[in-house]
Amino acid sequence: MLIEGLASVFLETDQSGDRVRPGAFAESLKRSRSFPMLWRHRPGAIAGVWTRFCETGRGLEVRGMVDTAKPYGRLADQEISRGLNGLSIGFRPQRWRFRPDGGRDLIELDLVEVSLVRDPMANGARFRVIETSDLRRVA
């Protein structure tokens, strides 16, 4: 199953008060183009593979394949069929500043992984299925 979406939405304040600034992933993406697709941020719970990462004016856009040959990929496939469509980034903040409201503006992030989740911290961090090999879903 091929999916794509926004893993991080620039300038959207998430549930924790963080707001990712445009360009926050630039250095991280220069260092690596390979980050795991995890199930709910669980280390080792590989659900698939991300094949594309791109910073756009909207945020960090991703594309990847859910691998139903893997246990967490099968679980993800089942949950996606029930409406799961959230994405969440795992990261280490490199540069940030606090805002007067107590939240953080995240200026530079070291991306670690992108997870499939039910309830993303950033409401706009969502994906959609763009291709499936399961003919039952197409019919």
Language model segments and positions:
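N-terminal "first-domain core" detector
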Residues: 1-25
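Residue microenvironments linked to proteolytic maturation
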Residues: 2-4, 11-12, 52-139
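Short, solvent-exposed polar/charged micro-motifs at secondary-structure junctions
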Residues: 16-17, 46-48, 98-101
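Acidic/polar N-terminal loop/beta-strand segments that form early-domain functional surfaces
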Residues: 8, 40-42, 65
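A short, contiguous, amphipathic alpha-helix enriched in charged residues
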Residues: 22-37
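Short conserved beta-strand and strand-loop elements enriched in small hydrophobics
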Residues: 33-43, 87
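Short, structured beta-strand-loop surface elements
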Residues: 40-58
